[in-house]
Amino acid sequence: MKTTLKYLLTATAASLVMTVSAYAAGPEIVKGPSKDAQCFKPLTAETKFFQWPKKEGPYRIALANGFIGNTWRIQMIQTAKAYAALPEVKAKLKEFKVVSTGDDVAAQIAAVDNFINSGYDAIVVNAQNPTAFKPVIKRANAAGVILVAFDNTLDTDEAINVNVDQKGLGELWGNWLVKNVPGNKGKLLEVRGVTGTSVDRDRHEGIQEVLKKSGGNWETVEVVGRWDDGTAQKVVADAIAVHKRFDGVSVQGGSTGTVRAMIDAKHPFVPVGGETENGFRKLCSQYSKEGLKCTSAGTGPAQVAVAIKTAIAALEGEVVPQSISLPLSVVEDPDFKDGDSFYSKETDNFFVGNSFPTCGINFTAQEIMGQSKADQ
């Protein structure tokens, strides 16, 4: 009896070690597509597919956010909590933790390391720096932890990235200005995002490449709006005070504040390429006939829900793309419609298009705003 029991314990321990070792080796590269191919759409035809060994739930999942000082990030945190609270998702979660560390890259990496060391099963991250996480990815793989980056993703093919085509978004804004600013020339104001992030870099590159390829005579004045209405309104007001007149504007975020700065300064309305803030779209509709010709494009904060959904699918042993491509939400003048592309009765500080129907993710403003923005 003792011999049999010893054998069973030894066999069980060996099996457990083999399972942990297999998981800790990181994902296996396999053939696609994913089971949920509509949601988990690969970025390109060359995107590889990952598969981890199936892990029994319920799971401990953490959101390691960096910068928190704007509406998009606050709404993202609220959306993450709303998604985790859905009955079908909540049933799969033992714990859902949220922490925001600010602009400090080292602090964000330390938070991720803390989650790894604390035994979390997966971590989703909106990265403050696209290149600083390579050692963290290795530590996550060694510990059997799945790392999913979204929005500000990572310059790597060794972790899962979930995002829209951020460079393509910059190209869209650039093409709007080339198309709508007369004469293929002029002075443009580019309101950038948070310095050092992949989103700011990629959107900027997209805009500038389009302007260069247009063959036009463009002068660009850059200011840093940090994707925040208050900050953008101040730096745009300062730019107008110095330069007096711009022929077109692109703004990565803080679009409502940017237009309000133009109104306050009595700057003539010009073509603007901006994000998907409800307040921005209200203004685009209100002042369209006075010359405010807008394209409003971006990605809703609900991409955090897609990142969590991806992490759970990977933990359940499903095949997922290394890089998942999400669609953009785009509305252009003259197609701004109340109750459809913007909501006049809702706050300005709300990002419209905050849904991904192909992933079964569609939140109302009330569902999101009912959640807190605090760490949990």
What are these regions (language model features)?
Residues 1-9:
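Bacterial N-terminal signal peptides that target proteins for export
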Residues 10-19:
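Bacterial N-terminal signal peptides
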Residues 23-376:
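A residue-level marker of the well-folded mature domains of exported/periplasmic proteins
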Residues 2-3, 19, 301:
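Conserved, well-structured beta-alpha core segment at the onset of a catalytic domain
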